[in-house]
A protein has these predicted regions:
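FNR/FR-type flavoprotein reductase catalytic core
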Residues: 57-189
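Ferredoxin-reductase
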Residues: 1-64
Length: 189
C-alpha cells in the first residue's frame, strides 16, 4: 500500500535512506517505515507498506483526513552518494520500496542508474512507472516470469556484470540471501 502523509516538518528535513516511526493509536505498536518519498512543497511524506500485522492492517483502513497518534522522523543516517557516476540498485521483495528512494535520489543527481527489481509474480509489482522514472535502465524480474524476465534479481545483475558493465557501487536491499548473493557476485569486480 502506498500512502502520502501530511507532515511538513518531516518532509522539510527528509533525505534518502531515512525512516519514520508511527503509531496509529494508544493501543497500537510503534513501527518503523522507510521514507519512500517526500514533497517539500506539499509537505508530504510517502510510505509504502505491506499488510502483514495488526498495525499495517489498521493503517490500511485509514481514510484521507484521518490522523495518526505518532509520526516521528526523519530518523536514521541519510545515504551518501558523492562521486558516483554509474550505480546498480538491486531491490527484491519488500526491499523494492526501500530501494526506490535510493535509485531516485541517485538519478536526480545525474548518476546513471541501473535498477533491478524483483517480485514473486506480476500481482505483487508496485510502482513500476515510478521505478522507470528513477533510473536509466529498469530490469523487472519475476520468479514465475509473469512480468518482465523470469528469475531472480541476482541473475540480472550477474548478466550485467558478465557483459562487462562497470559500476561505481551496487546497492542491494531485500532478503538476506539475496543481499549475500549480490555481495558474492560483486566481490570479483
Amino acid at each position: 500500500t502506498y500512502m502520502e502523509i501530511l507532515a511538513p516538518h518531516i518532509a522539510k528535513k527528509a533525505q534518502p535512506g531515512q525512516f519514520i516511526m508511527l503509531r496509529i493509536n494508544e493501543d497500537g505498536e510503534r513501527i518503523p517505515l522507510t521514507i519512500a518519498g517526500y514533497d517539500r512543497e506539499a509537505g508530504t511524506v510517502t510510505i509504502i507498506f505491506q499488510k502483514v500485522g495488526y498495525t499495517t492492517y489498521a493503517l490500511d483502513e485509514l481514510n484521507e483526513g484521518d490522523s495518526l497518534l505518532d509520526f516521528v522522523g526523519p530518523l536514521g543516517v541519510p545515504s551518501e552518494f558523492e562521486g558516483l557516476k554509474k550505480v546498480c540498485v538491486v531491490g527484491g521483495g519488500l526491499g523494492v520500496a526501500i530501494a526506490y528512494p535510493q535509485a531516485k535520489a541517485l538519478h536526480d543527481m545525474g548518476v546513471e542508474v541501473d535498477f533491478i527489481v524483483g517480485f514473486k509474480n506480476k500481482d505483487l509489482i508496485i510502482l513500476e512507472e515510478e521505478f522507470n522514472n528513477a533510473c536509466t535502465n529498469l530490469f523487472v524480474m519475476t520468479d514465475d516470469g509473469s512480468n518482465g524476465h523470469k528469475g531472480f534479481v541476482t541473475a540480472a545483475l550477474e548478466e550485467q556484470l558478465n557483459a562487462g558493465v562497470k559500476y561505481d557501487a551496487v546497492i542491494a536491499i531485500g532478503p538476506l540471501i539475496m543481499m549475500k548473493v549480490v555481495c558474492d557476485l560483486t566481490k570479483q569486480y
